Every structure is written in C-alpha cells, then in structure tokens.
C-alpha cells in the first residue's frame, strides 16, 4: 500500500462526540437510527448519558433509571425521545415513558413474548418493530393505557438481521435456506421484498460479512467474501434497483487483500478499511470498470491510504493541554453506517469525511477525475479548479481532446437539468401558485455556463482561447443547450480580437450564439473594427425582428433608402416618421437620396391625406424649404405645409 508523502483522503471529524469509555461499571450502546450513543453506568442506576450530533455540547439527555436485573442488551429512544425502549432479556422489552428529559419510572411497560428477540427498531414515535426468530412484528405503544398492541406481523424464521434506517429496510437472514430477504418496515406496514440472489442456494452468509447501506440513493447489500479462484477478498454489491425487482449482484469490488475488513459509505463512495495494513480503499460504483456477464468489477480509485492521523486533546488545567495520538484502525473501533466510527475504550465517536483535494493529486487521469468529482457533494469548486488548470498557460491548448471529453461530461448533466427546468416551467398552468410546484432536485454537481465563463475570462486574449471557446460552444450545441449572453459576448470579443470574422458570421447564421438585442448591440459597439461586424449584427437583429434597431443602424450608416424600405415593410406606411428620414437624408448631403426620400413622403401624403403637403405636426418645414431651394423645377408653386 502506498502511504508516501503523507497524503490522506479520509479524515475523522475534528471534534468527536466524547462519552464515558467502556469500563467495569460503564457499558456503551449506539442507536444508529437516532445516531445517539448511550453511556450506561451500573445498569442505569447511577446514570445514563445520551449524546448525539447537533445538540448543545452534544448532550441530549442525562437521567437515572432502576437496575431491574439482567444486563442491558439494547437501548434506544423513540424518534421524539419520549419513550425509551430497553431490552434486558431475550424475550422481553421494557418501555419507559419520559416527561421532558426525565423518566417516569413508575409507568414502565414490560412487553414479553414467547420468542427469541434478535433486536428492535423504532419506525415511528409510538411504533416499534420487534424482530425475533419467528418473524417481524410492529407494535403500537400506548402510554396512557400502559399497553403494547400488535398492528402488523410477518411470520418467517430469522437467524439474524441488519437494519438500514435511511430506507426503513431490514435485511433478514432466514433459518431455512440461508436466504437474505429485504423487508420494508414502516408505520403499520410490513412489505416483504424479493430475496437477494446469492447465486448458490446453499451458500451460507455470516452476519459479520454483510453491510446494509445506501449508495447513490439505492439500497445496497454489501457482502464480503473470498474469491473462489484467487482466495483474495472482494465485496459483492447487490442493488435493490426498483419495486418488485430482486436485488441483483451488479458490482464486485476487488480488494486484492486478506484479513479483517470493515465497510463505510462516505459521499456515495464505498470505503473498505483493512485493519492489517491500516489503510482504507475507495470504490465508486458510478465509474466504469471491467464488465463480465453484466457485472462490473472495480479496483480501488487509488492505492489504499491511511486515515489522516488524529490528535485528541486531553482534559488539562494548562492552556496548551496534552495531545493523544489516537490509534487508527484500532481493535476497539466499531463502525456504523453510513460513516460513523466509535472507539468505546477511548470514549470517542467520529464521522468520516472525504478529503477531495488530495484525491485530485492521486487521480492522474483528468477525465476519470472529472467523472469522480461530478458525483461528490463538494466536488464543484474542485472540478472548476481542475478545468481552470487544464485551460491555463502551462497546457497551451494542447489538451483539447481531453477538454472535449470533459465538456461532454459536464454538459450532459447540464442539459438534463436545463430540460427538467423547462418541463417544470411549461407543464404548469399560469394560475398555479409557485409555492405548490414540486421543486426539481439539482444534480450533485452542476457546472453552468456562467461558471465556465468565469474560468474562460482568466485566459482571455490568449492565442488558444478561441479554440477552447469553440470547443465548449460545440459541446453545448451537441446537447441542444443555447449559449447565454455572457458566453456569447466573450466568444464575440475573442473572434473580433483575432479578426475571425468568417467564424463569427457562421456562428450567427447557424444561431449558435444568443440572439438578442443586447448581444446585437454588443456587436454593433465593435463595428468600427470592421464593416463585416455591422452586417453580422444586422443579420442577428433581423432574425429577432428588431426592426427599430436595424433602421437606426442603417440611418447611422447613411443607408437611408434601405432603412426607409424596411420601415415601410415593418411599421406600415402611416407610422413611418417623415422628419427622422428627411433629416437622415439631409445629413448624407446627397441630393439624389434626399429627393427620393422627399418624393416618397409626398406620395405617402397623397395617399393618406389626399395632398402632397406635410402635416404641420411632423415639423418638416426646414426640409420643405431645402427641397424647394434645391429642386425649384419640381415646384413651380411652392408647397405649403398643410
């Protein structure tokens, strides 16, 4: 295993939850549903301290309860912390009601059965499921009547079970045939799901080899086993892919090691800890692997590395305090799903965190790294950093094929999100209040155009920037994503800077840039660079039928006749302002143009007002005088203003 350079991609949370360590007087229990840890002294007679994440000083409840004989096997609060369930005997469970944070010890409800109770789980504030050797039964606890009532049951022989609180699913190992059967357990509901396909009907699966968790929102049964050929250990990943579908072996994680292992899931990664080497292996089932018989075989993302060393600050009167270097992968460690590590002897409970930045150093394949970061909850900024490095000066645009693939990966996700947003906007009638709309869940990492523009702006005006921008634009077009304003303006700036006017003309003609008044005006602002730019802008304005702006541009360029023709066709004869066009024609100092424009409006006047004269409201007196002075032969009788 490679532990060089002190690079660690897994770390323990800096502030562990501290509790009384295991001793002759203190027993420690953990409830993985509420994420609460119980330190029970003298069977509860001298105190029970319950701690969990998120509470002030991590203390949830502290109380005492009577020792009713028999060692405590399991202890768990209801979700609202108002009923405490305690199992001391193999065939009974006690329910202690609470008022505030103190128990009502005079109102203990004892529920006894004739079976062997393997364990229990709370499924609601007042409902608990008992899992015994004969089946699963859901009970309602009625404190007011000091009763426990059965509301639902499933009869099945059970050897052991595993529980996934996030999915409310119990995995039952049956007495007959060693089958693994998932069961959905909710309030007043028990639903038996198709059994896990183990391949060999006689295969015996031990409880210690099975982990139940969720990966990418799908329930996963992880089974540790040795490879029949090599003898090395591997993990089978069986996924519950949908209602009514049997959990199927979809992936195999090749550990290539022997010894003791434990499994966590962190940020949708499967983390396999190897005690002998003191390393943790990372697997991502979303990444491609070797496919054999429709099963994907995965190797670790990188060579295994140790969890980051952890120094625990010990209680001390001095301000500096003493630091204890914790033993990693200790034999006293107990792991719970998804990412919990408990050292009962040390009295610490940690959560495992993923360190993204070191992994970016270890995964040299930039495309694979992109695929990896797109699935990480905090991968966006790191992915943007990676892309920024790829387009930076040191690469000088030589990694265009790699960038092309990366753009495809991020834009495929981006396109799905854009399409989903469009569907949500168009599927609802306008009178539906937005508060009632179901909000779309964005992808884990969403790289939008504005994110990319911020990266591209850092390499503006470099020789290869145009090539990278064209590559990104082509990728957007491939996924039918329209270029937005900021990106369109940046592409225009680069093309104009490089005098790539033919490329600019093609992009506009194929509508690959945003067609808007703002972008067209941005083009016009650069028209002094080359006359071709002005025509490109006019072409764009024509596509969006922004005739008013085109007319202004043409008038500014002295193309008065063209502007007049467009105004007549787009605005209608009666709405064409005579003064504006006569003034523009006068500014050209071309008598022929002025004459043509003047005569056009005379004919208009004749058609609209049955006279050649201009209405006084149009304020054309100076142009009438200019016409009369310039073309006296046309006006033997001076034309008045009507």
Curated annotation (Swiss-Prot):
If researchers knock out this gene, what phenotype do they report? Viable and fertile but with reduced lifespan, possibly due to impaired nephrocyte scavenger function. Severely impaired nephrocyte function under physiological stress conditions such as aging. Accumulation in nephrocytes of third instar larvae of enlarged alpha-vesicles (late endosomes) due to defects in endolysosomal maturation and lysosome acidification.
Q: Name the consequence of residue 535 to A.
A: Reduced interaction with Ccz1
| A GO cellular component annotation in the UniProt record | Mon1-Ccz1 complex
Q: Which Pfam families match?
A: RMC1_C, RMC1_N
Instruction: List UniProt keywords, sorted A-Z.
Output: Endosome, Transport
Hydrolase among the record's keywords? no
Q: Which residues form a coiled coil?
A: none
| Domain Mic1 as annotated: residue spans | 462-616
One of the GO BP terms on file: regulation of autophagy
Assembly description: Component of the Mon1-Ccz1 guanyl-nucleotide exchange factor complex made up of Mon1, Ccz1 and Bulli; the interaction of Bulli with the Mon1-Ccz1 heterodimer is mediated via the C-terminal Mic1 domain of Bulli. Mon1 and Ccz1 form a stable complex which displays Rab7 GEF activity with or without Bulli; GEF activity is enhanced by Bulli possibly by improving membrane association of the complex.
Please report which protein family the annotation says this sequence is part of.
Belongs to the RMC1 family.
* Protein name from the UniProt record: Regulator of MON1-CCZ1 complex
Organism classification: Eukaryota, Metazoa, Ecdysozoa, Arthropoda, Hexapoda
